[in-house]
């Protein structure tokens, strides 16, 4: 995988991959503040990779030291990224063309600078709806969630969801069984999730895309589950609440947050007996029952203040999105350039590829590729199956 300088800066500064010691990655608020400072100085985020530039920043010495420590772990990051890729997990940053365009457009300073993902990332650029609701949904709610997901799929819409039990998993399964596609923003345990047999098969079939804004090995927390709600709403063309408690729970909190921020049009199943649905309607959610009208027509014809009315876009058409920085002007980083000096230093005497791979904790296939490049550059020499440093 090849990353731009700006993307690598985001990965180094905003993730905890390979961090040892007491220092921590930047918070979203710190990252946005740093970005503004760099921009106001007339520089780019990529310049943070230059130690001399960091010294010029009008920030505290403690902050400078934090940036120095975070950006100085390039070799470790390269190994971690390779480890993730071997599992089928990749990274996209706000500086990449593949970053979900609606998150960037709607969330702005609230968008996560780095997302981990598994699956076909082009799905994130497709028009779709969010189907959300309680874990303890009743039988009628289950049936409604299934029918809505099936209707959306027949109309070539992606299902955006949160991957939780209850409404999330019911709508996801219904869409996939109907031949549709799912983009799921999960709040924890991406590494564990992709070990599920059904998930693996759906990823291979390009039916599901999983996103997480936290380290793939991070476990569950209520805060992280709540935080990912905004991603679901921002990514969707419209959001449909199947079943919600009143004044509590992730469904209620996420729906109210969406109403307050106007990320997407909000609909609530009007036949649900739960008080939460009724209260959401009183707060501005649009009452909804399944009808002959297409979902996109329902969304576009339903008035709701301060919400952008998107025109229908075919599911298989991806719009080009503007990016915050001109990638053409950005230097591209090959992970090989990050690790090559450390690889050379790891060779003692004569060693074969397997020994070097084990010493550096890198898969042999990847090591063979890098060793071949080192030989071609004259940094090491090869004699049959053995590698050594030049005399």
Regions found by a protein language model. Give the residues of each.
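Short, small/acidic-rich helices and loops at N termini and domain boundaries
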Residues: 1-95
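Glycine-biased, small-residue-rich flexible motifs in mid-sequence functional cores and linkers
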Residues: 1-27, 43, 86, 93-391
């Amino acid at each position: 995988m090849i990353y731009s300088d700006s993307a690598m800066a985001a990965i180094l500064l905003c993730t905890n991959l390979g961090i040892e010691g007491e220092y921590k990655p930047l918070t979203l608020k710190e990252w946005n503040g740093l970005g503004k400072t760099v921009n106001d100085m007339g520089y780019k985020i990529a310049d943070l990779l230059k130690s001399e530039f960091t010294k010029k920043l009008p920030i505290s010495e403690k902050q400078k030291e934090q940036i120095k420590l975070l950006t100085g772990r390039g070799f470790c990051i390269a190994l971690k990224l390779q480890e993730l890729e071997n599992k089928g997990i990749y990274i996209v940053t706000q500086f990449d063309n593949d970053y979900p365009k609606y998150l960037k457009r709607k969330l702005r300073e609230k968008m996560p600078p780095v997302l981990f993902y598994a699956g076909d990332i082009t799905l994130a650029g497709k028009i779709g709806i969010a189907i959300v609701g309680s874990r303890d949904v009743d039988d009628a709610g289950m049936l409604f969630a299934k029918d809505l997901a099936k209707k959306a799929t027949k109309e070539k819409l992606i299902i955006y969801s949160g991957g939780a039990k209850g409404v999330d998993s019911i709508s996801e399964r219904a869409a996939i069984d109907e031949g549709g596609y799912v983009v799921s923003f999960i709040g924890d345990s991406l590494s564990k999730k992709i070990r599920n047999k059904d998930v693996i098969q759906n990823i291979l079939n390009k039916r599901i895309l999983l996103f997480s804004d936290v380290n793939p090995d991070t476990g569950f927390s209520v805060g992280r589950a709540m935080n990912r709600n905004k991603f679901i709403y921002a990514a969707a063309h419209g959001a449909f609440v199947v079943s919600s408690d009143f004044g509590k729970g992730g469904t209620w909190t996420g729906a109210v947050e969406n109403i307050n921020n106007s990320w997407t049009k909000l609909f609530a199943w009007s036949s649900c007996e739960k008080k939460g649905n009724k209260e959401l309607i009183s707060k501005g959610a649009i009452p909804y029952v399944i009808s002959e009208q297409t979902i996109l027509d329902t969304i576009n014809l339903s008035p709701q203040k301060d919400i952008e009315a998107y025109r229908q876009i075919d599911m298989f058409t991806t719009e080009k999105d503007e990016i915050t920085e001109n990638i053409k002007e950005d230097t591209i980083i090959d992970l090989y350039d990050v690790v090559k000096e450390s690889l050379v230093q790891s060779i003692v005497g004569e060693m074969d590829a397997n020994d070097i791979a084990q010493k550096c904790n890198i898969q042999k296939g990847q090591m063979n590729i890098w060793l071949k490049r080192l030989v071609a550059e004259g940094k090491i020499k090869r004699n049959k199956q053995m590698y050594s440093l030049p005399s």
